[in-house]
Amino acid sequence: MEQFNAFKSLLKKHYEKTIGFHDKYIKDINRFVFKNNVLLILLENEFARNSLNDNSEIIHLAESLYEGIKSVNFVNEQDFFFNLAKLEENSRDTLYQNSGLSKNYTFQNFVISEGNKRAYEAGVRLAETQDNEFSPLFIYGETGLGKTHLLQAIGNEKFRNFPNARVKYVVSSDFAQEVVDAFYQRDKGIEKLKKNYENLDLVLIDDTQIFGRKEKTLEILFNIFNNLVLNKKQIVLVSDKAPDELIDIDARMISRFKSGLLLKIEKHNLSSLCEILTVKLKEKDPNIQITNEARHDAAQISGNDVRALNGIATKLLFFAKTSKQNLINTENLKEILFEEFEKFHKKSFDPYLLIENVCRRFNVPMDSVLSENRKAELVRVRDVCNYLLRQKYNMQFQQIGKIFKRSHSSVLMAVKRVAKMIENDSSLRDVITSLVI
């Protein structure tokens, strides 16, 4: 109100030569709103409205008080509420456009697994409230585990729950560039940058590990971070590394990162990777169908990388569109993803994903197979795992023995048993062949 009263004083001075204009039309104005860089003022008298709206000097008076103002509109009561509703809608649109978020990342299409469940729950809690109970929230984990998806989903859910929230998603390299640009601006560019961030309700920072060796950027971030915390604002940071593993970031900044809730996202299991691939395919084209075997194979060669899964889904979409075939099976999958299969066989793979796949095929618990339980059905599945790891993936007997807590000779005997069995059992041979990707 103080700012608007100052504006009225400027109007009074501007119209001092127009006898009675201020006292009759301006003095008693008390309904106004400044939103989305527009100053909307309720004024019932049509003559006064027209006079003020036609005066090009009015906007210049307002510019001295309202930073970034684009227009001053004097309207009647009916138009006031109509324009107010429109301004609020435009304001929400502008808030989202300036947020840096993508509508593609939501909680609805985020696949929850044991590895990300706690981080997901913390994100949901933060998006549903305006308190800073878990802030700063620091989420870390290896590349390709869906951290960026979760981070942006938090922002999108915040907008869904609080349409007028001020949210900003920024990658650390982009923030560093903002700092550089601010240094070259006149009129206290750095102070404006700080103010812009400190006025936010929720700040989402991606790739925090890249901040290393950017001393000036870290200094600015430190100041912003402190003020956000002091003002009980919400902060979420995402990194490939835990705070203590970050390189070239000083201790006081590390301490700030660790001052809230610290959560790690673990690798996905095979079933979660399969579900993620299903979601990705459905998003691209709900008509594409994929067999369970093909889905498992595609998930296994993804390297536990959600981005790689998205690339696989894109290739499957391209195949479906160009070949007019909507069903993906193991045969055409190996044709479509020939390069991916080649790379998978050449590089080191995760033996536990294979073991999980075998256990699913034989319908036995993976933890039982990895235990020392000697039940016949578990021994058989354990032997099959040993055989595949040795014969198809060329793992050393000692490495296999370490996984199953068995001796070199025990693994060797298991491999020989399975080799002999598949000579006489065609159904087992077919099953083992299908398990090799």
UniProtKB/Swiss-Prot annotation:
It comes from the Bacteria. Pfam families: Bac_DnaA, Bac_DnaA_C. Residues 100-320 are annotated as: Domain III, AAA+ region. One of its GO terms (biological process) is DNA replication initiation. The keyword Ribosomal protein does not apply. The keyword Cytoplasm applies. HAMAP family: DnaA_bact. Belongs to the DnaA family. Oligomerizes as a right-handed, spiral filament on DNA at oriC. NCBIfam families: DnaA, PRK00149.3-3. This is Chromosomal replication initiator protein DnaA. It comes from Mycoplasma genitalium (strain ATCC 33530 / DSM 19775 / NCTC 10195 / G37) (Mycoplasmoides genitalium). The lineage of its organism: Bacteria, Bacillati, Mycoplasmatota, Mycoplasmoidales, Mycoplasmoidaceae. The gene is dnaA.
